[in-house]
Amino acid sequence: MIKLAIALAADSAASITTPTGPKVFNTANKLFALSKFAPVGLLVYNAPEINGVPLEVIVKEYREHIGRKRFQTLKEYVDSFSSFLQDGPPMGKESQEINFGGLVHFGLRQVYLRAVRIRRHDETPSHDFNVYLRRAVDELVKVAKRRGRLKAFEDIDAEKVWKERRQLLSKLHEIVIEQFKEEHEIPDLPGKLRKDIEMAAILVVFSKGRLAGYTGIVIAGYGDKEYFPSYVQYETDGFTPYGLRCTDADMSTISHTNGAELGAFAQREMTQRHLEQ
C-alpha cells in the first residue's frame, strides 16, 4: 500500500474445519470486488466461509444489496458490510445455532486435548484421567479470564448459557468423550466436573483468542472523500445466538507521515521470505 494505490494478493489455498479435521482446498477464490462502482475490494484468508456460507456468495449478494451506493470513507463500507452480514437471511437462527454448536465442540475438545498433554508430561501419571481433566479445566479458565471477553460476549452470563443449552452441551460432550475413548480410558465424570468442563468450553468460545476455523477478512480501498488508501482487517468465527464472534477491527491508513505499508495475514512467514529475497 502506497499513496497512489493499494494491491491485494493471495494464493488459492483455503481451509475449512470439519468434524474429522481441517480440509484444504487449492482452488478457492479469495479476492472480490466489494462494489462494482467504487474502488473497494475484499480479501479472505483461512476459512472462505461464514456460518457455512461461502464468502463469494455473500459478497455477490452484498453487491446486489448496495447497488450504486457509495460511501465517503472505507470504514463506512466496513460497517455496511457488517450490518449486511448481521441482517442477511443466510445468518438466521438455525445457522447461528449450528455454528455455536461447532464452536462449543471445539472448546470441549480443547479441554480433553489439554488433559492428555498434562498427563503425557506428568512424571508420575495417575490412572484417574479425571485428575487431568480437572487441571485442564482450571488452566483453560485462567487463560480465558486472562484474555478477556470478546466485545459481543462481554455481558453474557456463561452460567445462564449453560442452563439454556444443557441438552446441546450434553450431546456434544458425549460425542467428544466417545472420540477420546478410542485412544484413552475415560472414567465416568462426576456431575460437577462434567459441568465445569462444559462451562470451560463456553468460556473458550466467549474469550479472545483465535480458534481453528476462523475466517480472516481484509477490506481495502478508498472512500469518496479519502485521498489515500487504507485497509481494515479482522477475524471472525461467525454468528452465534449470543452475537458475532469477531476480533476488533485493525485499520491501517496511508497518510502524509506514513507513505507506504506492507500487511501480511495468515501465513506471515511467506511475506517475510519474500522480503528477504
Regions found by a protein language model. Name each.
Residues M1-Q277:
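N-terminal nucleophile
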